[in-house]
């Protein structure tokens, strides 16, 4: 936006300090072969409306999430190739992984109604390579599969479960007379520590960090949780497949994000978010030994999310990325600034 450039706001500072060329729509878009739209979903329609008027013939439009195409139903000019490169984590984590010479698991797709020159897949591959995604894994998906699996993952295991479980586990520890500062650190940094094992060996390696007795206990708790939460996960999946969830979310957009902002305020004022800082170091294995319930919650949530997505017809690649592989990257955001950070960047 022109006023952002004139005011030299934080986005302008970030871009210029990292050697990106900064200018307004009218100056940059008409000459671009590839235009990548990384704005929030809520802004997509107005942004795309402006872009289409300025994009040159036979250029390419890139998305990092397909909500605007699938749920809103945006129509793009036929001469424009439309692709998607969807890293399975918040944008902040994409940048951090790239800076350390790696990348994040990524889904790529081509809009079947906008690939007139049959170049979309090659462009998507090149884009994913440029952000380091090939180091972690790039899988071809579809716009529909990416959107439905993304929404399901975020509402259940990735964000919904991590948030609810953090509050639940903290309150339970306090009830059991645990030091509030220790309880807070165990949970805040426990998710990141425990889910790191998922990167290297999935649920099996995570469970193997426990003693035999603790492993059996975690398994039994996990099975109980799955029975309790299965109907809730199924309702989430049904609402996402039918479009009901997206419809309600877009209504909230029209109401100035009232529900979203109310939820953020409530979370920010919870005892967990306001808890004191624990300054002592917690050994890595202690997070596992004292986090059996957390491990059981992760196991049940991953399995339930994956199973519900597969049953709904979502391809395994998308279901896997959105139930297990993205989880450590979401946990990283909690480790930095608890739940408020996660809520802000997702």
From Swiss-Prot:
Its cofactor is Mg(2+). NADP(+) binds at residues 11, 41-43, 91. Pathway: Amino-acid biosynthesis; L-isoleucine biosynthesis; L-isoleucine from 2-oxobutanoate: step 2/4; Amino-acid biosynthesis; L-valine biosynthesis; L-valine from pyruvate: step 2/4. It is an enzyme of class 1 (oxidoreductase). GO terms for biological process: isoleucine biosynthetic process; L-valine biosynthetic process. The active site is at 65. Pfam families: KARI_C, KARI_N. Residues 1-141 form the KARI N-terminal Rossmann domain. Mg(2+) 1 binds at residues 150, 154. Its EC number is 1.1.1.86. The keyword Oxidoreductase applies. It catalyses: (2R)-2,3-dihydroxy-3-methylbutanoate + NADP(+) = (2S)-2-acetolactate + NADPH + H(+); (2R,3R)-2,3-dihydroxy-3-methylpentanoate + NADP(+) = (S)-2-ethyl-2-hydroxy-3-oxobutanoate + NADPH + H(+). Keywords: Amino-acid biosynthesis, Branched-chain amino acid biosynthesis, Magnesium, Metal-binding, NADP, Oxidoreductase, Repeat. GO terms for molecular function: ketol-acid reductoisomerase activity; metal ion binding; NADP binding. Belongs to the ketol-acid reductoisomerase family. Involved in the biosynthesis of branched-chain amino acids (BCAA). Catalyzes an alkyl-migration followed by a ketol-acid reduction of (S)-2-acetolactate (S2AL) to yield (R)-2,3-dihydroxy-isovalerate. In the isomerase reaction, S2AL is rearranged via a Mg-dependent methyl migration to produce 3-hydroxy-3-methyl-2-ketobutyrate (HMKB). In the reductase reaction, this 2-ketoacid undergoes a metal-dependent reduction by NADPH to yield (R)-2,3-dihydroxy-isovalerate. This is Ketol-acid reductoisomerase (NADP(+)). The lineage of its organism: Bacteria, Pseudomonadati, Pseudomonadota, Gammaproteobacteria, Enterobacterales. The gene is ilvC.
């Amino acid at each position: 936006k022109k006023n952002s450039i004139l005011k030299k706001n934080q986005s302008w500072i970030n871009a210029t300090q990292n050697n990106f060329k900064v200018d307004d729509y009218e100056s940059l878009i008409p000459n671009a072969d590839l235009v990548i739209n990384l704005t929030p979903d809520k802004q997509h329609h107005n942004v795309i409306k402006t872009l289409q008027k300025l994009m040159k013939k036979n250029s390419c439009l890139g998305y990092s999430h397909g909500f605007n195409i699938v749920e809103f139903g945006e129509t793009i000019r036929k001469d424009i190739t439309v692709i998607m490169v969807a890293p399975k984590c918040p944008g902040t984590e994409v940048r951090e992984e790239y800076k350390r010479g790696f990348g994040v698991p990524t889904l790529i797709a081509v809009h079947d109604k906008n690939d007139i020159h049959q170049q979309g897949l090659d462009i998507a591959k090149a884009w994913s390579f440029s952000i380091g995604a090939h180091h972690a894994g790039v899988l071809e998906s579809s716009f529909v599969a990416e959107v439905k699996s993304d929404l399901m993952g975020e509402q259940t295991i990735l964000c919904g479960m991590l948030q609810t479980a953090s509050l639940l586990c903290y309150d339970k520890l306090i009830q059991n007379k645990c030091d509030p500062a220790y309880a807070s650190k165990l949970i805040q940094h426990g998710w990141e520590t425990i889910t790191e094992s998922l990167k290297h060996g999935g649920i099996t390696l995570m469970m193997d960090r426990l003693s035999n007795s603790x492993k059996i206990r975690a398994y039994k708790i996990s099975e109980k949780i799955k029975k309790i939460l299965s109907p809730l996960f199924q309702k989430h999946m049904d609402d996402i497949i039918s479009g009901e969830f997206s419809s309600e979310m877009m209504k909230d957009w029209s109401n100035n994000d009232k529900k979203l902002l109310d939820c953020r305020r409530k979370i920010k004022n919870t005892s967990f978010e306001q808890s004191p800082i624990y300054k002592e170091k917690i050994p890595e294995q202690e997070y596992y030994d004292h986090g059996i319930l957390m491990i059981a919650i992760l196991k049940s949530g991953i399995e339930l999310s994956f199973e519900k997505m597969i049953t709904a017809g979502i391809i395994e690649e998308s279901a896997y990325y959105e139930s297990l592989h993205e989880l450590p990257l979401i946990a990283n955001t909690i480790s930095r600034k608890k739940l408020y950070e996660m809520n802000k960047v997702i």
